[in-house]
Amino acid sequence: LFGETSEKIDFGTRSKTLITSFKIAEAKAIYLDSSPVRSRIEAKKYTTPIRHGSVTYYGPFIFADDHVGGKGHREKLGALCGFLQSGPYGQAKDYYNRAVEEEIGIPPRDPKRRSGTSSVRPW
């Protein structure tokens, strides 16, 4: 339903070259007929800075909230499988959520007040 997403991370090498590139697996379909939905979802690009580089997400994203179990946090539906295959899920999810919040204009929150994100250090 959501297509394939790639993440590219530049860790700030002296040559400014991309040293890590990996793909997030295609999400499992959660809709009986995904083709009409997929054709209507416009691909978007979100970039967020991290220490010594940035994380960029690109693809046709759909966001969810309480009505699909997001519990108030914007989630990328169907991407859980891919994040789990791509390394530390919590850190990747936090980077992604921060990028989305910046894109839609939500100011950053105080990292000390955030709950459930103790694995991420403030930058």
From Swiss-Prot:
Q: Does the keyword Oxidoreductase apply?
A: no
Subcellular location field:
Virion
Q: Which InterPro entries match?
A: Rhabdo_matrix
Q: In its keyword annotation, does this UniProt entry include Cell inner membrane? A: no
Task: Give the record's GO CC terms.
Answer: virion component
Chain segments carrying region Disordered: 104-123
Gene Ontology MF terms in the entry: structural constituent of virion
A Pfam family annotated for this chain is Rhabdo_matrix
* Family (UniProt): Belongs to the novirhabdovirus matrix protein family.
Q: What is this protein called?
A: Matrix protein
Organism of provenance? Viral hemorrhagic septicemia virus (strain 07-71)
